Amino acid sequence: MKTIMIAFIRGYQKFISPLTPPSCRFYPTCSQYGIEAVKTHGALKGGWLTLKRILKCHPFHPGGVDPVPDKKQKH
């Protein structure tokens, strides 16, 4: 599942993103954030973090640096 999600995001980066002007107000970009989130947290939690990030990407949010949170260690 992780591989499929990352392939989908990479497809977006390669084929769709170049057709639109740069508009992401965050660093890293939302698509790069999605890849990092899925790699770090897996498909379910990484997908959820990516969805939350995309929903924040609008003109009324200031944006800025928003890294993927670290994976919490189980004790």
Swiss-Prot record:
Protein's recorded name: Putative membrane protein insertion efficiency factor
HAMAP family xref list: UPF0161_YidD
Main subcellular location: membrane
InterPro entries, per the entry: Membr_insert_effic_factor_YidD
Keyword Membrane: yes
Keywords assigned by UniProt, alphabetized: Cell membrane, Membrane
Subcellular location: Cell membrane
Organism: Bacillus velezensis (strain DSM 23117 / BGSC 10A6 / LMG 26770 / FZB42) (Bacillus amyloliquefaciens subsp. plantarum)
Gene Ontology CC: plasma membrane
Function: Could be involved in insertion of integral membrane proteins into the membrane.
